[in-house]
Design a protein with these regions (language model features):
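Feature primarily recognizes SF3-like P-loop helicase cores of small DNA viruses
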Residues: 2-93, 121-523
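Short beta-strand segments and strand-loop junctions that repeat across beta-rich extracellular domains
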Residues: 91-108, 159-161
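Trp- and S/T/G-rich repeat-edge/linker motifs of beta-rich repeat architectures
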Residues: 107-122
Length: 523
């Protein structure tokens, strides 16, 4: 049976690639390219020797697109990396190439620029159209793989660290990582002391961490957070919110250390307000952490779904400019620095459970040492010790100190006026039965007094919010919010809040005297 030109060239490519892979040492790209062209030319010449005039084939002078795709798929480690746990749509997966050397050694890079760089080793002047065609071929034929999800395995700069056994293993294409820390794991790392001749001070990272808070529990959890940002396979299910209304408190310097641990290009800087915006989440694809040391004052988050999904590792849609959107599960940890607590529309307990507030109460104004951030935290021996310390700790959950729990409760009230209202008012109520209409009128006046503007929340929404929070007040219940209830004598006591908030509609309708005690009894 007569063979086509494409079939002949394909067979010549397969033979040359197989010969290359059989060699003790893989030939260079130029050698592989040359052997394929030689095989192809020989096959074409043989065909042309017996072909009739006008039916002869053109002798190839450079590789065809499908030949380059074949080389890429068989000489290099090319894989289609699934970005979610679903296997339904290969079009939403990322094409990655395993890097056997260079700064990305041991991980799969999904950058088109890196794939193009390798393709140009076989055809220097590959066109945009040819590159896109090659990518389509590889997407169809590349094996599909899953990102490594073993929570004990961590990709550091010089290998894969097993957190459980505390051992360093070599990289392998079978363990699919798309990112790694830029810091080596050094089992001999020590906490070095750095002396500054100019001001006569000595500095070491252990002592410096202790200066960030007088609360030992806070220092401990800060070390745990440093570890969390390089352990992306652990489902922490929380995001860290480092909070202080004043500057010069160490937050920014600590973030600089985090970035040194993760490495340039391996963290995303997405402020809270951008999680609901289009095209702002694409940096997550190649990141293992989100580190933001500045959020706008007065930030209001209307749509928190993406933020919650990123924190919990649920699937989100990532819209990419000029590319097809993909479904993506972010694996990593988030740190956001705040100078003011953000207001979020989502006031559910499921959202609050994801928040780890860490108050920074120290102030280093007048005692700043900029060289800590600009010099010390960039030194190899310093970051290698930090890496060594956090990888030799033993934890899969955070040890949350009381001060952080208190900060979260304060934030809940700050973010939710109804919660704050109930915390203040419920213990003060005198009546044993409180109509929702009374509580709503009281809330509106309280809101004007303490928030300073008119509340627009409707009665129905208010009732819903109250019922959601009522579980925090075991002395109160509401079996059926829609059922009419006769108060009988449950409203006979004086309700002093009527007078305090001047609820004119709730003063007694039968008593006309000046006795306050009688005027605030409902009749």
């Amino acid at each position: 049976m007569a063979r086509t030109y494409e079939e002949t060239i394909y067979d010549a490519t397969v033979d040359a690639v197989n010969d290359a892979l059989a060699q003790p040492v893989l030939p260079s790209p130029d050698e592989i390219k040359g052997n394929i062209l030689d095989n192809s030319r020989n096959a074409v010449t043989m065909y042309n020797s017996i072909a009739q005039q006008g039916a002869k084939w053109k002798v190839p002078m450079e590789l065809e697109t499908y030949q380059i795709a074949y080389i890429m798929l068989h000489v290099h480690y090319i894989a289609l990396i699934e970005t979610t746990e679903s296997e339904d749509d290969a079009d939403c997966s990322l094409l990655g190439v395993y890097m056997e050397d260079g700064e990305d050694e041991g991980i799969y890079t999904t950058k088109d620029s890196e794939v193009r760089r390798i393709a140009r080793l076989y055809k220097r002047r590959i066109t945009y159209k040819e590159f896109q065609e090659m990518m389509y071929i590889m997407r169809e034929e590349a094996p599909r793989v899953k990102r490594c999800s073993e929570r004990n395995l961590i990709a550091v700069n010089n290998g894969i660290f097993d957190f459980d056994t505390k051992t360093l293993m070599p990289f392998t294409p079978d363990k699919v990582f798309t990112s790694k820390s830029r810091v080596d794991y050094n089992p001999n790392a020590k906490n070095v002391v750095i002396h500054n001749d100019e001001d006569g001070t000595d500095w070491d990272v252990e002592s410096w961490m202790n200066t960030l808070s007088d609360d030992k529990g806070v220092v401990t959890i800060l070390w745990q957070i440093l570890g969390a940002i390089i352990r992306p396979n652990v489902s922490w299910n929380k995001a860290c919110f480092m909070y202080s209304e004043s500057g010069n408190n160490g937050k920014g310097t600590l973030c600089a250390l985090m970035r040194q641990l993760v490495g340039e290009g391996r963290y995303a800087s997405i402020p809270l307000k951008d999680f609901g915006k289009d095209f702002m989440l694409e940096p997550l694809i190649r990141a293992t952490s989100v580190i933001v040391d500045e959020n706008d004052v007065g930030t209001y988050i209307d749509k928190a779904a993406n933020l919650k999904a990123v924190i919990t590792g649920d699937t989100i849609q990532v819209n990419r400019k000029f590319k097809q959107p993909i479904s993506f599960k972010f694996k990593g940890f988030m740190v956001q620095c705040l100078n003011e607590m953000p207001r979020v529309k989502d006031k559910s307990d499921s959202f609050y459970r994801r928040q780890l507030f860490i108050p920074f109460t120290k102030c280093f104004t007048g005692a700043e040492r900029k060289y800590i951030k600009d010099d010390y935290l960039k030194r190899k021996e310093v970051v290698e010790y930090v890496m060594y310390k956090v990888l030799n700790m033993n934890y899969y959950e955070f040890d949350v100190p009381e001060v952080c729990k208190t900060a979260l409760e304060e934030y809940k009230e700050f973010n939710d006026p109804v919660r704050q209202f109930m915390a203040e008012i419920m213990p003060e109520l005198q009546w044993d039965f409180v109509p929702f209409t009374f509580l709503y009128d009281l809330y509106k006046e309280w809101y004007k007094k303490y928030v300073g503007k008119q509340e627009v929340k409707s009665l129905q929404v208010f009732i819903k919010d109250v019922l959601n929070l009522l579980k925090d007040y075991p002395d109160w219940d509401c079996p059926d919010s829609k059922k009419a209830v006769r108060p009988k004598n449950m409203m006979d006591k004086p309700e002093w809040l009527i007078d305090e908030y001047k609820l004119e509609d709730w003063y007694s309708t039968t008593y006309k005297g000046n006795d306050l005690k009688k005027s605030v009894v409902r009749r």
